[in-house]
Amino acid sequence: MSETKIRTLQGVVVSNKMDKSIVVLIERRVKHPMYGKYMTRSTKLKAHDETNVCNEGDLVTITEVAPISKSKNWKLVDVITKA
């Protein structure tokens, strides 16, 4: 069988006000199809933080998992740098 690649992303924690949950801002660079200018696009993802170790401004790695709740499909893997 073919192996599926596990999706992991890096981003900055912008909110940790929820219990065992964080909001991670993911930024990516995309090229405009007509004009060729590179633009920054961003996405906010909710992730599960079981031990509540993250604070705002932390650089973290998250991975995609089975749905935990209505809006949480990501889980915290590790904290790269603390704020």
Swiss-Prot record:
SUPFAM superfamilies tied to this protein: Nucleic acid-binding proteins
Gene3D superfamilies: Nucleic acid-binding proteins (2.40.50.140)
Residue spans crossing the bilayer: none
Presence of the UniProt keyword Ribosomal protein in the record: yes
Single GO BP term: translation
Entry GO CC: cytosolic small ribosomal subunit
Pfam families according to UniProt: Ribosomal_S17
Top-level taxon of origin: Bacteria
Keyword RNA-binding included in the entry's annotation: yes
One GO MF term attached to the UniProt entry: structural constituent of ribosome
UniProt keywords, alphabetically: Ribonucleoprotein, Ribosomal protein, RNA-binding, rRNA-binding
The protein's assembly and partners: Part of the 30S ribosomal subunit.
Family according to the record: Belongs to the universal ribosomal protein uS17 family.
Family annotation (NCBIfam families): PRK05610.1, uS17_bact
Name of the protein in its database record: Small ribosomal subunit protein uS17
Gene encoding the protein: rpsQ
